[in-house]
Amino acid sequence: MAEHLASIFGTEKDRVNCPFYFKIGACRHGDRCSRLHNKPSVSPTLLLSNMYLRPDMITPGIDAQGNPIDPEKIQADFEDFYEDIFEELSKYGEIESLHVCDNFADHMIGNVYVQFREEDQAARALQALTGRYYSGRPIIVEFSPVSDFREATCRQYEENSCNRGGYCNFMHVKEIGRDLRKRLFGHLHRSRRSHSHGRSRSPSPYHYRRDYDRRSSSRSRDHDDYYRGGSHDYYRGGSRRSSERHRSSYDSDGSRRRHRSRTRSPVRDGSEERRAQIEQWNREREAAQV
């Protein structure tokens, strides 16, 4: 019996534990779910809920004023965000992977998953980010049970064949460009190869492009000093792309320090029609499995 329960744990056959929360760390039912959400007390993976606000979050491809948005601008906005959050999170440890959801369902939209190499690194990040703000919005961060993103991501989406679109309950991971990925993660991979060949290990990859201004006596800062909160008073941007194009802030008091001159994306309200559509899709899925 114990072996049977262990074999079905976190699967659709498990009637006690929620399989979606186990695989994805998020469930469309939230606290109303009839199955248990076993939240880990420690994990190398963190979930930052609804953190990314895309410019077309209300209607895909359309801004808040009803005007079409160039897909290249949407991607540029996303890569600014991705680089910004990578650089902030990398202060606390070595990042194995960083994923941002492209889903539209309320429990998935804008979710950021970061997996550190060690659990204690994730714990440091959790402690540092709790109670802080990003672009005037509180950061909602918690340990996530996700350990294998292959089980959490939608394979049909990767093949451009998901018929549920943005309301799929599995992760639709928004991709960054090859150049940015190489710049952010390339040094990490080179450092590991060097270590595996017995050479002295390179300096920790999450310090590879930054100087940290730890001075706290003066409130007058260069315009590139745009982070506030946590253990460091300010974070000095060293990347040309980040310092010149992206001005997002991590604030400890909720005050806004906007990035660039963009109008902030409006907060997305829940839609009864959209929820009904999601419910219908899930009923169809459950019926197909019977």
From Swiss-Prot:
Stated name of the protein: Splicing factor U2af small subunit A
Compartments it resides in: Nucleus
Keywords, sorted A to Z: DNA-binding, Metal-binding, mRNA processing, mRNA splicing, Nucleus, Repeat, RNA-binding, Zinc, Zinc-finger
Record region (Disordered): 188-290
Domain RRM, chain residue ranges per copy: 44-146
Composition bias type Basic residues, residue spans: 188-200, 256-265
Comp. bias intervals (Basic and acidic residues): 208-255, 266-290
Any one GO cellular component localisation term in the record: spliceosomal complex
Zn-finger region bounds: C3H1-type: 12-40, 148-175
A Pfam family this chain is assigned to: zf-CCCH
Gene expressing this chain: U2AF35A
Highest taxon of the lineage: Eukaryota
Role this protein plays: Necessary for the splicing of pre-mRNA.
Keyword DNA-binding: yes
Main location: nucleus
CDD domains registered for this protein in UniProt: RRM_U2AF35B
SUPFAM superfamilies attached to this UniProt entry: RNA-binding domain, RBD
Keyword Zinc found: yes
GO molecular function annotation: DNA binding; pre-mRNA 3'-splice site binding; zinc ion binding
